[in-house]
């Protein structure tokens, strides 16, 4: 779920503020998404959106509401003991996105952009 995802980002990027920083970034970070990603970070969000879309094809899986178990160790997120396919899948979506975010530069000019750029 989004609370776990936010915590995973804080694990890979200590001191970050995931909700304000990433909820309205580029064309894909935040709700929805379209067009061409504006940079590497936005591409991370596009891939994460697709991963959640793939998770929704698992019967009964609702990624935004799915609770899972994970652990943060040395800026790495580790998915732990998630007994259902949905939980394991969603945890991995969030884990991979958090790692991607940690590698991608944050460009303030791509925060709260005019969405006409995303067509």
Swiss-Prot record:
Glycosylation sites: 82
GO molecular function, one term: calcium-dependent phospholipase A2 activity
Gene Ontology BP annotations: arachidonate secretion; fatty acid biosynthetic process; lipid catabolic process; phospholipid metabolic process; positive regulation of fibroblast proliferation
Gene3D superfamilies, per database record: Phospholipase A2 domain
Biological role stated in the UniProt entry: Snake venom phospholipase A2 (PLA2) that shows weak myotoxicity and induces edema in mice. Shows no cytotoxicity in vitro. Has an anticoagulant effect in vitro. PLA2 catalyzes the calcium-dependent hydrolysis of the 2-acyl groups in 3-sn-phosphoglycerides.
Transmembrane segment boundaries: none
EC number(s) recorded for this UniProt protein: 3.1.1.4
Keyword Disulfide bond appears in the UniProt entry: yes
GO cellular component: extracellular region
Catalyzed reaction equations: a 1,2-diacyl-sn-glycero-3-phosphocholine + H2O = a 1-acyl-sn-glycero-3-phosphocholine + a fatty acid + H(+)
S-S bonds: 11-72, 27-118, 29-45, 44-100, 51-93, 61-86, 79-91
Positions bound to Ca(2+): 28, 30, 32, 49
Family (UniProt): Belongs to the phospholipase A2 family. Group I subfamily. D49 sub-subfamily.
Keyword list, A-Z: Calcium, Disulfide bond, Glycoprotein, Hydrolase, Lipid degradation, Lipid metabolism, Metal-binding, Secreted
Cofactor descriptive note: Binds 1 Ca(2+) ion per subunit.
Tissue specificity annotation: Expressed by the venom gland.
Record organism: Micrurus mipartitus
InterPro entries per the UniProt record, alphabetical: PLipase_A2, PLipase_A2_Asp_AS, PLipase_A2_dom, PLipase_A2_dom_sf, PLipase_A2_His_AS
Residues annotated as catalytic: 48, 94
Localization in the cell: Secreted
Name recorded for this polypeptide: Basic phospholipase A2
Cofactor(s), names only, from the UniProt record: Ca(2+)
Chief location bin: secreted
